[in-house]
C-alpha cells in the first residue's frame, strides 16, 4: 500500500507478513487475534498494532525482522509463542504488551526491544536478555509450569507496574531482587513465589 491506512476487520491466519508499502499503513484492528506462521518483516510503510493480538508462530532466526521503527504498538499484544527458538532480529522496536510463551529461547538484542505494557513469561519460554521496561511497564509470570526466574527479572526493578506472579506454577527467584520506591510485587491468590533464600528488598533500601 502506497498511502492511507488499511484496517483489518477480522481475524487473520496466514504465513509470513511483509510490510513494504512506500507510505501506507496496515492497522491490525480492534480486539482481533492474528496468527502468522512465517516471518514478520518490516521494510517500509507502517504496521500499526491497534488493540489486537499478533501471534508470531514461526521457528526462525528472523522471526521479527527488518526496521523496528516501522511498527507502532498502539495497545496491542505481540506474542512469540512458537514451540522452540525465535529471534527478534529487527532494529530497535517498541512494543506495548509482549508475551514470550510455549517453549524455547526467545533471543533479544539488548537495547533493541522495549515494552511499555506487560511483559508476560508463559509456558517454559526463556529470553536471552531482558527487554527495556518503559516507565509504567510490568513483568508477569503467567504459567502453570514451575520455573526459575531469568534475566527478564532485572534488579533493581524500576518500572512502576512491578512484578506479578499470576498463575499456579511456582516461580523461584534466581538472585536477590530490589524493588525501587513505589514498585510493587504482587503474588496472586493461589500462586507461589519461592525466594530460594535470596533477599527481597522493597523501596530501594
Feature roles, as predicted:
Residues 1-205:
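Sequence/structural signature of small/polar-enriched beta-strand/turn repeats
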Amino acid at each position: 500500500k502506497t498511502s492511507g491506512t488499511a484496517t483489518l476487520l477480522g481475524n487473520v491466519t496466514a504465513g509470513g507478513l511483509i510490510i513494504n508499502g512506500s507510505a501506507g499503513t496496515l492497522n491490525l484492528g480492534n480486539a482481533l487475534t492474528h496468527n502468522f506462521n512465517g516471518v514478520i518483516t518490516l521494510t517500509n510503510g507502517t504496521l500499526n498494532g491497534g488493540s489486537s493480538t499478533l501471534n508470531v508462530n514461526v521457528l526462525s532466526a528472523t522471526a521479527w525482522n527488518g526496521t523496528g521503527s516501522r511498527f507502532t504498538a498502539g495497545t496491542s499484544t505481540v506474542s512469540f509463542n512458537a514451540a522452540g527458538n525465535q529471534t527478534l532480529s529487527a532494529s530497535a522496536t517498541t512494543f506495548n504488551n509482549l508475551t514470550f510463551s510455549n517453549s524455547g529461547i526467545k533471543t533479544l538484542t539488548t537495547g533493541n526491544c522495549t515494552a511499555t505494557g506487560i511483559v508476560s513469561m508463559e509456558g517454559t519460554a526463556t529470553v536471552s536478555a531482558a527487554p527495556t521496561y518503559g516507565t509504567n511497564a510490568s513483568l508477569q509470570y503467567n504459567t502453570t509450569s514451575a520455573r526459575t526466574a531469568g534475566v527478564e527479572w532485572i534488579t533493581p526493578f524500576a518500572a512502576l507496574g512491578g512484578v506479578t506472579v499470576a498463575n499456579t506454577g511456582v516461580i523461584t527467584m534466581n538472585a536477590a531482587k530490589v524493588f525501587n520506591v513505589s514498585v510493587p510485587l504482587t503474588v496472586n491468590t493461589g500462586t507461589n513465589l519461592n525466594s530460594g533464600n535470596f533477599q527481597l528488598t522493597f523501596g530501594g533500601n
